[in-house]
C-alpha cells in the first residue's frame, strides 16, 4: 500500500459520512453496520459512510448518517456539489456481519445485519449506481481501508468462528500459567 506523502487519514465512527476532494485514506471498523464507498475514477474524489440502521421515519429532521437511506443521500449530495453525477462513481459495499450468530433464529431478536445488507443493495439498485464489489454478510467484523488516490479498498474480515477460537486459545494460555 504505497501511500503518497502528506496524505490525511480519517477514521469513521458509526453514523459518520466523509467526502474528500484530496488524497485521503478513510478507515472504519464494521460489525453489523455497513460501509458504502464512493470513488470517482477520473476526478479521484469520493467518500464513505458507516451506517447503523436501514432507515427511520423522518419528519423535517436533518439528514443523519446513522441511517442507510440518509447516508446515501448525503454521499449523493456531495457528488452533485462537486460537479459529478452519482452514476459516475464506483461503489463498493462492505459489512453486515452477524455479531450474535447464536441468536440468529430467535424470533424476538431483529437481525440488523441482514436488514442493513438488504438496504445497501436496494439503495445501490434504486440509484442505479455502478456496484463494483461487495463483501457482505457472514459473521464477525471487518476492518476497511479506502484509499481515495487510487480507489483501492482493503478489507480484513474476522469471522466470529476465528474470534471465538482466538479467545479460547488465549484463555487456555492464561489458565496454563
UniProtKB/Swiss-Prot annotation:
The reactions it catalyses are: L-glutaminyl-[protein] + H2O = L-glutamyl-[protein] + NH4(+)
Organism superkingdom: Bacteria
Its GO biological process annotations read: chemotaxis
> Which Pfam families does the entry link to?
CheD
Q: Does the keyword Calcium apply?
A: no
E.C. code: 3.5.1.44
User: InterPro entries from the xrefs?
Assistant: CheD-like_sf, Chemorcpt_Glu_NH3ase_CheD, Cytotoxic_necrot_fac-like_cat
Gene Ontology terms for molecular function: protein-glutamine glutaminase activity
Would I find Hydrolase among this entry's keywords?
yes
Q: What CDD domains does the record point to? A: CheD
What keywords does the record list, in alphabetical order? Chemotaxis, Hydrolase
Summarize the protein's role: Probably deamidates glutamine residues to glutamate on methyl-accepting chemotaxis receptors (MCPs), playing an important role in chemotaxis.
Q: Which family does it belong to?
A: Belongs to the CheD family.
Report the protein name in the record: Probable chemoreceptor glutamine deamidase CheD
Amino acid at each position: 500500500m504505497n501511500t503518497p506523502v502528506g496524505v490525511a487519514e480519517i477514521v469513521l465512527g458509526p453514523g459518520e459520512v466523509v467526502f474528500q476532494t484530496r488524497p485521503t485514506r478513510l478507515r472504519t471498523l464494521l460489525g453489523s453496520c455497513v460501509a458504502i464507498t464512493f470513488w470517482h475514477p477520473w476526478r479521484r474524489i469520493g467518500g464513505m459512510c458507516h451506517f447503523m440502521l436501514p432507515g427511520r421515519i423522518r419528519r423535517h429532521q436533518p439528514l443523519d448518517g446513522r441511517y442507510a437511506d440518509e447516508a446515501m443521500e448525503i454521499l449523493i449530495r456531495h457528488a452533485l456539489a462537486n460537479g459529478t453525477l452519482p452514476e459516475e462513481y464506483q461503489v463498493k459495499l462492505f459489512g453486515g456481519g452477524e455479531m450474535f450468530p447464536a441468536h440468529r433464529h430467535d424470533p424476538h431478536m431483529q437481525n440488523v445485519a441482514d436488514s442493513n445488507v438488504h438496504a445497501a443493495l436496494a439503495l445501490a439498485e434504486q440509484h442505479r449506481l455502478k456496484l463494483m464489489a461487495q463483501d457482505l454478510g457472514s459473521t464477525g467484523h471487518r476492518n476497511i481501508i479506502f484509499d481515495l488516490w487510487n480507489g483501492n479498498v482493503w478489507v480484513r474480515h474476522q469471522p466470529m468462528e476465528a474470534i471465538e477460537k482466538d479467545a479460547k486459545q488465549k484463555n487456555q494460555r492464561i489458565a496454563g500459567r
